Amino acid sequence: LAMHMDGARIWHAAVAMGIPEATIAEPFDSLSVCFSKGLGAPVGSALVGSRKFIEKARRYRKMYGGGVRQAGIIAAGALYALEHHRARLADDHREARRFAAAVAKMEGLRVDLERVQSNIVRYEVTAMSANAFVDACHARGLHMLPGGHHGVRAVMHLDVGPADVDAALAIIADVLAAARA
């Protein structure tokens, strides 16, 4: 039985675990990687596998009308992201941990700090529904995703620096204060 890995976030996983991407991918027959999630390329994914597998994938892509003109431009963006942005992924992890630590201290929010291992922070809103919380944050310029009735997901990335995290925390504190008023 062949195994495929959705490796969209493999770059962050490798940095978080302190191991090469190849070590993560080794048990799989194929994997897909994404150059825009985490690395910050404007667009682009790649399929990795044996020569036979890739030849078959190319044939299917062609049969279904898939294809990319000027693929070199996309490849250049992906290569730039690999060469210039991979090393800074640890910054995203650090900011995620800092964000989570601050969230953990806020009344009306709950986060398991042990689960914050990369650039994604999942936490719970106990002061209101996740949708109401996310909507109130969005109205103030902060974009996060609700997940279930109380869950919220925040993601740190290339375009989120320390000042942005501070601003996000201020908005969250403001939303919680308004909910208590």
Region locations from a protein language model:
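Conserved PLP-enzyme active-site core in the AAT-like
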Residues: 1-125, 131-140, 144-160, 164, ...
